[in-house]
Amino acid sequence: MLVLSRKIGESIIIGDNIEVKVLKIESGTVKIGIIAPTNVKIYRQEIYQTVAEQNKKTISEIVNSPDDLKHLKEVLKNVNKNR
């Protein structure tokens, strides 16, 4: 893990097109701003983890056999084609 120190108004650059800037530090909370292309998905870790857990639970409720899994794979493939 890379650990960096930044002051208010200072940034770090990730890759060629993502900037993370420290906007405010108050009461033990750091407010950051992120500038990134619209195709880069950005989530708070706790939200990402909750959604992933819900997705796993939903799939386990839907998939009862290998045939169910094959069908789900085909459905998802078709959904992605139509995007």
From Swiss-Prot:
One of its GO terms (biological process) is bacterial-type flagellum organization. It is found in: Cytoplasm. Keywords: Bacterial flagellum biogenesis, Cytoplasm, Repressor, RNA-binding, Translation regulation. One of its GO terms (cellular component) is cytosol. One of its GO terms (molecular function) is mRNA 5'-UTR binding. Its main location: cytoplasm. InterPro entries: CsrA, CsrA_sf. Pfam families: CsrA. SUPFAM superfamilies: CsrA-like. HAMAP family: CsrA. Belongs to the CsrA/RsmA family. A translational regulator that binds mRNA to regulate translation initiation and/or mRNA stability. Usually binds in the 5'-UTR at or near the Shine-Dalgarno sequence preventing ribosome-binding, thus repressing translation. Its main target seems to be the major flagellin gene, while its function is anatagonized by FliW. Homodimer; the beta-strands of each monomer intercalate to form a hydrophobic core, while the alpha-helices form wings that extend away from the core. This is Translational regulator CsrA. It comes from Fervidobacterium nodosum (strain ATCC 35602 / DSM 5306 / Rt17-B1). The gene is csrA.
